[in-house]
């Protein structure tokens, strides 16, 4: 990454595209403080006040869900809600959250190790919904999901985009075009928006492919 200077607006889903090794996950890890940046800072405007992004601002959903498999779904949600009790805004009951994610009653008291990939992904998404982060990072979150669960997740993300910045990293261009409001390329370590003005969907897709191909040839 180099000379990253970019402004994301709340209320939009940004599709982050780039070739393999372009630095998409590195950018997320820097935002999430998992990697230390060599220079510069990330800022967020809240209520007209500019400040540095903190860990509490970030929600991070990985392509491979990480959940404590020795807990049941209900125990996991209760644990998360208990440790974040003071910061939760208008919390619902555990079963209301399960209903929201279409997790069936018979699955709620199963161990997480017995959950399918899609259900683990739903649980990972659910704790981010409960936390209500200002910035939601999604690193290939729909990978390996079946068609029904993937469509449910897309509808969920559209409903959640208000009042937060959502950045969706994917290598599937059609998914990005279907879900995202803006397409951003990570090109030679620099972020740049792909302008869609006056282009139909085919022309827009061709423009993205040309930009990615140019990156690979340089």
Regions found by a protein language model. Name each.
Residues 136-140:
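Catalytic Walker B motif of ABC-type/P-loop ATPase nucleotide-binding domains
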Residues 147-149:
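Helix N-cap at the start of a conserved alpha-helix in ABC-type nucleotide-binding domains
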Residues 32:
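Helix-to-loop junction immediately C-terminal to a conserved catalytic motif
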Residues 188-189:
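Conserved ABC ATPase "signature" C-loop
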Residues 64, 70-84:
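Q-loop/switch helix immediately C-terminal to the Walker
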């Amino acid at each position: 990454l180099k000379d990253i200077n970019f402004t994301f607006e709340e209320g939009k889903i940004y599709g982050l595209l780039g070739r393999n090794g372009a630095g998409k996950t590195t950018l997320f890890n820097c935002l999430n403080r998992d990697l230390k940046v060599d220079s510069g800072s990330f800022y967020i405007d809240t209520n007209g006040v500019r400040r540095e992004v903190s860990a509490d601002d970030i929600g991070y959903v990985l392509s491979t869900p990480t959940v404590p498999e020795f807990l049941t779904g209900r125990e996991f949600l209760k644990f998360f809600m208990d440790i974040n009790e003071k910061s939760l805004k208008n919390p619902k009951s555990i079963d209301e959250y399960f209903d929201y994610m279409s997790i069936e009653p018979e699955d709620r008291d199963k161990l997480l190790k017995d959950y399918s990939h899609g259900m683990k992904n739903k649980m990972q998404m659910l704790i981010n919904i409960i936390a209500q982060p200002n910035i939601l990072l999604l690193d290939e979150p729909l990978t390996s999901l079946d068609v029904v669960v993937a469509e449910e997740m897309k509808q969920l993300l559209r409903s959640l985009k208000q009042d937060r910045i959502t950045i969706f990293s994917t290598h599937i261009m059609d998914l990005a075009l279907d879900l995202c409001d803006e397409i951003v390329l990570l090109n030679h370590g620099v972020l740049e928006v792909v302008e869609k003005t006056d282009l139909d969907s085919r022309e827009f897709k061709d423009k993205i492919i040309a930009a990615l191909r140019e990156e690979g040839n340089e």
